[in-house]
């Protein structure tokens, strides 16, 4: 690949009973907070799968979140998904077409469906919403405040892909970080603002650990699509039948059902800058139906990019190998998707930094989490019935890769330990580590953590890509 083509900026969150439609929603304020994420309509918004706004899982953590008093953090790597966005180009066309078809064929729009008669589809496509930008500012502030013993004097080294919503998310993270620093009277006043240090182009022409595109067999895989089709055929026909009975003249496919459900989260995160107004699409569906929708999106990511796809985890191997290099301050060893040109240079891949921040997409985060073995306890998901998070060992798309998802890899030094300890937090849930012996707080010794990443060290099954 041509090095000059790399773009660098180096100088640079109901009245509900099962089966009962949801009641009307009013406005809420203070929906989003730096510490807890999105807290409005939790019975509903926590069931939006990968379209859920980030919400803290601290209360679901099997281990305490606080750092013990005899320990101090010496290294942090945050890996984050971009903030809330509008639908992709293809989904924009599909959603608008479903709504237009209903408006053309329906002979009546009773009750809660009245808004559809004159509804004008006006969502943007692909880009961050104002709420999504605020999510990333909040993430920057959270990062600064959580690790202020370091951030008062040290800037994170920041990488992103060159996709607009990803790169802008990194920029908003920087804004939130720097604003928090400026409000901190204990911070070094002479420390310059951080910046987006590296922006890596997306596409099959570039090696990029923050975006999949190189593994040809994976890119043509239909495993995820097949799983989605299987479960859609299980839960959506009954919904289509109910909606058709409510909207005389309308005929709906199962895909139309999924499209209408998706309008609920997408419009909610687009209407206001704190997502305090719930879209009227949300009340068209029952609590049970939202549970099914949430599971559908979990299946999509599990079979598309996680352990349910034979080539899913290997898409995250490159980033896992970069993490090991950063933890040990040793050169990267990888023959998958690492950009060797960038990773060989201290300017674009320093090994002596203390704080790192990488920004990517939901799909890539799923692959990376599996490459790290974080969900090794998750058995193959059923494609015919809903499984709870207790049945999936803590995996669900809304718990794993919501809008503005964040994973923290922390290394800490403790008085009673000669070797530093490592733990991983996904959306404030301290993860059970599967590849190394853990203590009662869910931590592994650094060398054991690295040794446990044998799948990544061996390059996974990258050879099956071609």
UniProtKB/Swiss-Prot annotation:
PROSITE patterns: HIS_ACID_PHOSPHAT_1 (PS00616), HIS_ACID_PHOSPHAT_2 (PS00778). Residues 1-19 form the signal peptide. It is found in: Secreted. One of its GO terms (cellular component) is extracellular region. It is an enzyme of class 3 (hydrolase). Gene3D superfamilies: Phosphoglycerate mutase-like. Optimum pH is 5.5. Active from 2.5 to 7.5 with phytic acid as substrate. The optimum pH is shifted to more acidic values with 4-nitrophenyl phosphate as substrate. Its EC number is 3.1.3.-, 3.1.3.8. The active site is at 82 (nucleophile). Disulfide bonds join 31-40, 71-414, 215-465, 264-282, 436-444. Glycans are attached at residues 120, 207, 230, 339, 352, 376. 1D-myo-inositol hexakisphosphate binds at residues 51, 81-82, 85, 88, 165, 301, 361-362. Pfam families: His_Phos_2. Coiled coil: none annotated. It catalyses: 1D-myo-inositol hexakisphosphate + H2O = 1D-myo-inositol 1,2,4,5,6-pentakisphosphate + phosphate; 1D-myo-inositol 1,2,4,5,6-pentakisphosphate + H2O = 1D-myo-inositol 1,2,5,6-tetrakisphosphate + phosphate; 1D-myo-inositol 1,2,5,6-tetrakisphosphate + H2O = 1D-myo-inositol 1,2,6-trisphosphate + phosphate; 1D-myo-inositol 1,2,6-trisphosphate + H2O = 1D-myo-inositol 1,2-bisphosphate + phosphate. Keywords: Disulfide bond, Glycoprotein, Hydrolase, Secreted, Signal. The keyword Acetylation does not apply. Monomer. Belongs to the histidine acid phosphatase family. This is Phytase A. It comes from Aspergillus terreus. The lineage of its organism: Eukaryota, Fungi, Dikarya, Ascomycota, Pezizomycotina. The gene is phyA.
